[in-house]
Amino acid sequence: MAFRKSNVYLSLVNSYIIDSPQPSSINYWWNMGSLLGLCLVIQIVTGIFMAMHYSSNIELAFSSVEHIMRDVHNGYILRYLHANGASFFFMVMFMHMAKGLYYGSYRSPRVTLWNVGVIIFILTIATAFLGYCCVYGQMSHWGATVITNLFSAIPFVGNDIVSWLWGGFNMEDPYYSNMMLNKSVLCWNIFIWMMNYYIIQLIIYNNMIWNKNNMVKMFIMRRKLAVINMYMYMKLIIQRTYSYYMNNTIIYDKNHKLNTDNPIYAYIGGLFEGDGWITISKKGKYLLYELGIEMHIRDIQLLYKIKNILGIGKVTIKKLKMKDGTIKEMCKFNVRNKNHLKNIIIPIFDKYPMLTNKHYDYLYFKDNLLKDIKYYNDLSYYLRPIKPFNTTEDILNKNYFSSWLIGFFEAESCFSIYKPMNKKMKTASFEVSQNNSMEVMLAIKSYLKITQNIYTDKFNNSRMTTKSINGIKNVVMFINNNPIKLLGYKKLQYLLFLKDLRTITKYNNYFKIPPKY
């Protein structure tokens, strides 16, 4: 007997490839199924090797693909094999489906077989789309946005499903991490479904006798497939949890301390002083330490940027019912984790101290947090002092004041163009206000060389407005020349402000308005 027939392993290959009995009416169209299997193996193998070098991080995805093409040995061959293999996979699949339609493979008794093939086809389309999203760029970004927005057509829960798929209100890191993970799982699911497909073919084409032994064999095989599926989905859950953890932590330097040299943290400090809070509240007999910022819903993108920069906290939406019955939507970013507060927030505010009287709140907050005060009864009485923490000169001498000021403007400033009554020409206006912060307002006035007076109302809210040509010029030049830029809705307001400013002769003739920001 030939060795290929006597060997336990080779005999299996021999029975299916060499000595496999086939009907005389079979033709070359029946090669499509085996070619599909070959294409799938090529896709899985090349995909595994490329995944070793690919990063699903939103900032590294495109660079990692470039790394595969340029730095990985024969990486370009892997990528081209993967890309062209996908094209051939679909070409062969469509020919395979056309053969099935032509020969009536969808009719009884092969209905189940055809349905399994349809499921494989749908899974393949989904897998191809996920791979299309992995290279983070404009095309994949908007392609993913459009396709996933299809779920918004589902009544009642559509928008929630879209937000869940995105991992937030825009394309966040978890979305692209999940794309990569889901793609790998779907590849294995296609492989498993193809095994089912093959088993059903055996049942139909070889006229298997449904005796007790064969039923046991089929039962065992399907249980094995169920175990494989369960393993893959458990692996997916673990990977998604790990991905969520990695996307909600921040990178430390070698000494495990936050690197606060980036002036963007001064910007965040100014933003918190404008619209943020830092509190110790009672939760039963325990204390809840919290730092947060609340803004209008239009600034939700800004809060997500802050979350991504810090790597901690969460963003939520809440609806407020106004006195007139209308609903106002607000978004909130807050941090409650003590380790995050100690290791990230405190180093930032130690490096860039608050300039308003909120610094008293911070010192009280920091003292209790570092002492690990847990119970409400152990908390000492606190009342914010009235005396200013910093003088105007102290504020102006801070080397981070310009970066801090951009963040403060993001929260508390307003750019507007309006037409006064009985006047033909429009007027530009810049306004900034804050409660219990006269020294900060005086520092801003001095720093920007604004001549207008500061108005303080009976609630101790200080407001400064400038409409003069020189004042508007100083504000525009400061914002445009600052290395730290506006990041939220205020940026859009400022861009529209510049656009309208170019149409006002008295400003346009006096100084050169920046063409872009």
From Swiss-Prot:
Keyword Metal-binding on entry: no
Consequence of substituting P515S: In strain: 777-3A
Superkingdom of origin organism: Eukaryota
GO biological process, one term: mRNA processing
Compartments in which it is found: Mitochondrion inner membrane
SUPFAM superfamilies: Homing endonucleases, Transmembrane di-heme cytochromes
Effect after changing Q434M: In strain: 777-3A
Record has Lyase as a keyword: no
Record region (Cytochrome b): 1-169
Stretches in topological domain Mitochondrial intermembrane: 53-84, 137-145, 206-224
TM helices/strands, residue ranges: 32-52, 85-105, 116-136, 146-166, 185-205, 225-242
Main location: mitochondrion
Mitochondrial matrix side stretches: 1-31, 106-115, 167-184, 243-517
Result, substituting E412K: In strain: 777-3A
Gene Ontology CC annotation, any one: mitochondrial inner membrane
Region (Maturase): 170-517
Protein family: In the N-terminal section; belongs to the cytochrome b family.
PANTHER family: CYTOCHROME B (PTHR19271:SF16)
Function: Mitochondrial mRNA maturase required for splicing of intron 3 of the cytochrome b (COB) gene, containing its own coding sequence. In vivo splicing requires the formation of a ribonucleoprotein complex together with the imported mitochondrial RNA-splicing protein MRS1. The complex seems to stimulate the intrinsic ribozyme activity of intron bI3 through binding to and stabilizing specific secondary and tertiary structure elements in the RNA.
The protein's name in its UniProt record: Cytochrome b mRNA maturase bI3
